[in-house]
């Protein structure tokens, strides 16, 4: 399951609640073509990797979160571990790289 993040507080709470689990965050926008293309794949990964937390942040709805995380383009995927420490990031709708990065970190 992918959790939709609606606020900066909700983002921080989700990172805190994850504990030692890997958190994968998809920063996207409704108007972004590549974001729309990779969204179903991102959701399928959430079913496949049940021990990983998947979050979605709409950069238009949560500009403060996107700004704090220094998101410059969409889609951007960020990976967090252990109490919100960022351990990886890449931009672009690259399915293979997304799954490979999860496998490296999990």
Curated annotation (Swiss-Prot):
Family classification:
Belongs to the thioredoxin family.
State the encoding gene. TXN
An individual GO BP term: response to radiation
At which residues is there a site annotated Contributes to redox potential value? 33-34
**Biological role:** Participates in various redox reactions through the reversible oxidation of its active center dithiol to a disulfide and catalyzes dithiol-disulfide exchange reactions. Plays a role in the reversible S-nitrosylation of cysteine residues in target proteins, and thereby contributes to the response to intracellular nitric oxide. Nitrosylates the active site Cys of CASP3 in response to nitric oxide (NO), and thereby inhibits caspase-3 activity.
SUPFAM superfamilies in alphabetical order: Thioredoxin-like
Q: Where is the Thioredoxin domain?
A: 3-106
Spell out the disulfide connections. Answer: 32-35
Q: Name one GO cellular component term.
A: nucleus
**Do the record's keywords include Phosphoprotein?**
no
GO MF annotation terms? protein-disulfide reductase activity
The residues annotated as site (Deprotonates C-terminal active site Cys) are: 26
Q: How is it modified after translation?
A: In the fully reduced protein, both Cys-69 and Cys-73 are nitrosylated in response to nitric oxide (NO). When two disulfide bonds are present in the protein, only Cys-73 is nitrosylated. Cys-73 can serve as donor for nitrosylation of target proteins.
The record lists the organism as Pongo abelii
Per its record, how is this protein called by name?
A: Thioredoxin
Q: Which residues carry this modification: S-nitrosocysteine?
A: 62, 69, 73
> Which CDD domains does the annotation name?
TRX_family
Q: How does it assemble?
A: Homodimer; disulfide-linked. Interacts with TXNIP through the redox-active site. Interacts with MAP3K5 and CASP3. Interacts with APEX1; the interaction stimulates the FOS/JUN AP-1 DNA-binding activity in a redox-dependent manner.
Q: Which UniProt keywords apply?
A: Acetylation, Activator, Cytoplasm, Disulfide bond, Electron transport, Nucleus, Redox-active center, S-nitrosylation, Secreted, Transcription, Transcription regulation, Transport
A matching Pfam family:
Thioredoxin
Instruction: Provide the positions where the record notes the PTM N6-acetyllysine.
Output: 3, 39, 95
Presence of keyword Acetylation: yes
Annotated compartments = Nucleus; Cytoplasm; Secreted
Q: Which residues carry this modification: N6-succinyllysine?
A: 8, 95
Matching InterPro entries, A to Z? Thioredoxin, Thioredoxin-like_sf, Thioredoxin_CS, Thioredoxin_domain
Active site feature: 32, 35
């Amino acid at each position: 399951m992918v959790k939709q993040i609606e606020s900066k507080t909700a983002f921080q709470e989700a990172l805190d609640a994850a504990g030692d689990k890997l958190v994968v965050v998809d920063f996207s926008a409704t108007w972004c073509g590549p974001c729309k293309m990779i969204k179903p794949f991102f959701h399928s990964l959430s079913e496949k990797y049940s021990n990983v937390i998947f979050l979605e942040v709409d950069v238009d709805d949560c500009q403060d979160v996107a700004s704090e995380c220094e998101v410059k383009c969409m889609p951007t995927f960020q990976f967090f571990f252990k109490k919100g420490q960022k351990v990886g990031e890449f931009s672009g709708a690259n399915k293979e790289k997304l799954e490979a990065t999860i496998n490296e970190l999990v």
